[in-house]
Amino acid sequence: MSFPCKFVASFLLIFNVSSKGAVSKEITNALETWGALGQDINLDIPSFQMSDDIDDIKWEKTSDKKKIAQFRKEKETFKEKDTYKLFKNGTLKIKHLKTDDQDIYKVSIYDTKGKNVLEKIFDLKIQERVSKPKISWTCINTTLTCEVMNGTDPELNLYQDGKHLKLSQRVITHKWTTSLSAKFKCTAGNKVSKESSVEPVSCPEKGLDIYLIIGICGGGSLLMVFVALLVFYITKRKKQRSRRNDEELETRAHRVATEERGRKPHQIPASTPQNPATSQHPPPPPGHRSQAPSHRPPPPGHRVQHQPQKRPPAPSGTQVHQQKGPPLPRPRVQPKPPHGAAENSLSPSSN
C-alpha cells in the first residue's frame, strides 16, 4: 500500500473513533427526559435565565444534525414544522409525540458577541401510557389475578390490606388456602404514567362463586327449554300419526262398504211351507172321517221318522220365524171300521 493510501486510512480511522467518542460523551452528559406517546412535552433549559445579552438560541437533532428551531434577536423565529414551538425563554415544545420523535436533542445559546454561553443535551425517550389494571378472582380456585393490557414496560405491584405481596410486568397471580376477606390494590406504572385499582374480596370457606351460580342457572334453563321442545315434538308426531291412522281406517271402511253393496243378493220370497212332510201325506179314503190327533204317543216301533229338511236361506232384510228344536212327531191315523160290521159283531154276543 502506498503512503497516501495509508495516510487517508489513518485519518478516517482517527476521525471515526473521535466521532464515536464525542457521541458517547454527549449521551453520557445528556439529560434523560421521558415523554408520553401522543402527548405534548416541553424541553426546559435548566439553570438558564433569558437576558438582553442573548442573541441566538438554536435547537437541533443530533441523529441527523438538522436544525429544527431557532430564535434570534430582531428576526422571526424559525421552526422546521408545526410540530415544534420555541418560546422566548428558550424552551422547546414538541406536540403530539410520535415514536420517531425519540432522539437526542441539543440546544446551543450564544450572546451578542457570538460566544457560546450554554450548551445542553436532552435524551428524549417515549413510552405508551399504561392502562388501568384489572383485578379478577374466583373463590372456587382461590385465585386472584391482576393484569394490565396497555403500556410500555409496565410494572405491576399487588398489595393486600396495604402489605406488598408481589411485583411483575404484565400479570400477577395470587393464591390463598383459607377463607379470605381483604382489600386488594393493584398498581401499574411506567416512566410516564401510573394507574391503580382497588377491590374488596370476600370468599367464605365453602362459598359458591357467582360465575358457577350463573353457569348452573344457565344450564338448567337450557335443559328445560330442550325438554319442552322434545315434549312438543313427540306430541306433534303422535297427533300426526293418529290423524293418519284415522284417515286410513275411514278409507278402508268406505272401501269395504262399497264392496259389500256390490255383492248383496236379491230378496227371496218367504212363501215356503215350514214342514213339507205334511203336504206329502196321502189323503184319507172316502167315507172316513179324519180323527183329530190325540196327545197319546204312538206305540213303539211304529214312530214315524221324519228326515230333516234343509231350510232355504233367509232373505236379507226379512225376519223368518224359526222353530226351536226338532219337529214334534205326528200321531198315526187309524181308519174307522164300517157301521155294518160293527153291528154284526155285536149281534152274536146278544144271542
UniProtKB/Swiss-Prot annotation:
It is found in: Cell membrane. Residues 25-209 are extracellular. The chain crosses the membrane at residues 210-235. GO terms for molecular function: identical protein binding; receptor tyrosine kinase binding; signaling receptor activity; signaling receptor binding. Expressed in natural killer cells (at protein level). It is a single-pass type I membrane protein. This is T-cell surface antigen CD2. It comes from Homo sapiens.
